[in-house]
Amino acid sequence: MSKSYSYLFSGTKGSITHDKSVIEKVSRGKLKAWAKDKMASLTGKAKSSFNTACIVYDESTGKCYYGRNGGYKENGYTKNPLLFGDDTHDGILPKSPLNKFPVGNCAEVDAVNKALNAGAKLKDLHLTTIHVTKRAFGEYKASCENCKYTFKGRVKENYSGWVDN
């Protein structure tokens, strides 16, 4: 992808805002643009299975991180131990799926994982998740049961909401 999506506000490297209405509006717009570019860069099964995208805004740095469903399957993916655990500690993801999707498959997990690997703290993160299917492109998509278990009460905000159980 040729465009830069690193910061929420282009041309203002490191600009930070705490205004939730601004974050929500700008995040969603950037996410839609990123998702279109990402879709255009994918082929085969990766393209046909891409149905969800997430942007994570770190309010402490102004940086953005993007994720897609199935992103953890990409080559070179580094699983953050806070999420996935390690040899000595369990991660905060559920041990087994709370729905029909594999634990760690979600766009939210992909984006948050990237943010954590860059040094972000969960308490500073704002999440926005959208559908990227032709039928519902750009519409908000509530975070699933696995993500609700993992992130609700730990992240600053989720503009797409949480699935109802």
Where are these regions (language model features)?
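Zinc-dependent deaminase catalytic domain
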Residues: S4-N165
